[in-house]
Each structure stands twice: as structure tokens, then as C-alpha cells.
Amino acid sequence: MPALPPGSVLIVVKRGPNAGSRFLLDQPVTSAGRHPGSDIFLDDVTVSRRHAEFRWENDEFHVVDVGSLNSTYVNREPVDSAVLVNGDEVQIGKFRLTFLTKPKNHGGAGGTHDSGPADR
């Protein structure tokens, strides 16, 4: 996989029927579920039609379970909502997704700033 550009946020499907798929999180809210209109379409009976959302709030990305039947997990722990950091594993049904982010560099001595959709 090519290097992630500074300021980018990406979800990579590591396990599940569409392993290897990548989704750029470039909106304030990105939906994930079995509904064909989902931003991240996960087509399996273990996934609710409207399962979870990835939200950019208060300069952080959150994953929020939106009433799924089988729960949403972060690093193998069930969550209603959780702040995501680089490398976290999000499980939605049988799908395992990796959250990847690369902070924007603003020059200076190692100064970084987490970027999200509002910064673009």
C-alpha cells in the first residue's frame, strides 16, 4: 500500500468478504452497514443495515454504534462509542477494519496537527 499522505484518514478492510478494500474518511460522518446506500458497504448478514458511523467531532474521529444487532468492537471490546487512534481495529460483524491516520506536518520541530474533514 502506498504511503498515506499527511492529513489523511483511511479505513482498510483487513478481514471479511471484501478484504483489501480502502475507504477514505473525508466527510464529517461516514456510515457503515449492509444498506447499499452506506458509505462503507459491508454486505454480510452479521452486519446491520445501519450498523455504525465514523464521526469527526472535537478534532477526533469516533466510531459510534447506531443500534446494531451484533455490536461494534474496537480492539475486541464492545463499544457504543469510542475515540479512534492510528492502528485501532474496528470490528463490524465479521469484518475487521483498521483505522489509519497520518497527522499533517506543519513544519517546525516535530509539530503535528491531527487533521480531519473540517481542515480540508
Predicted regions and their residues:
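Intrinsically disordered, low-complexity acidic Ser/Thr-rich regulatory segments
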Residues: M1-L42, N105-R120
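Short, charged beta-turn/beta-strand-edge "cap" motif at the junction between a beta-strand
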Residues: R96-T98, P103
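Short Asp/Glu-rich motifs
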Residues: Q91, K102, A109
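Forkhead-associated
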Residues: S21-K94
